[in-house]
Amino acid sequence: MGSPLQTLSRGGRVRAALWCWTQARGLSGRQCPNRVARSLSCSRGFPVRGGRPALGGTMVSVLTESFLQGTQHFSSWDCCQSLHRHRAPVQVTDSRRNLGMDHREEGFQVGTEDDREPKASLPRGNPTGPPCSLPPELEPPTNCCMSGCPNCVWVDYAEALLRLYQDGGEKALAILEEHVTDENLKAFLRMEIRLRMQSGA
């Protein structure tokens, strides 16, 4: 029945399908419309006109497909399943998802704008104050022979600092701590400064 049924018009296919359905179910001709109407009413969204289902293109394709596949037991349950297969899938709009994404993106952009705000930079350097600046004539000596001679240029340097800063030697000690790197020389100069502070020189 496959190829002759395909060549029929829509009305012819409907009549042929209904005739096969009644023959398979063993129904009489007058019982066919009522039973078909009750069987087709199980499908949701199927239009009904005057107590009978309106056989549109969807129902025609359902009946044709069932009999082209050689189905002999065409019941109301088969009709419902076929109609569900032929129903167009519902297209879910992305408005809700886009709305949520807009809020998330907006929050993300706001956060990035806050993060891009310039932050106050912390001052660098010595927190206690700028390093001591010395006049050119009081720069640390670079011509020490490191032999321990009595006329050491570092001793002369310490005496010059004591004469410049009349504060009891504290400023001179601070300058020596900053400019002298050798620990032995630093200890020697601290001792010389304290001796001169005690002697009042």
Swiss-Prot record:
Region feature (Disordered): 102-134
Species: Mus musculus
GO cellular component labels: mitochondrion
Protein name: Oxidoreductase-like domain-containing protein 1
Oxidoreductase-like domain span: 134-161
Top-level taxonomic group: Eukaryota
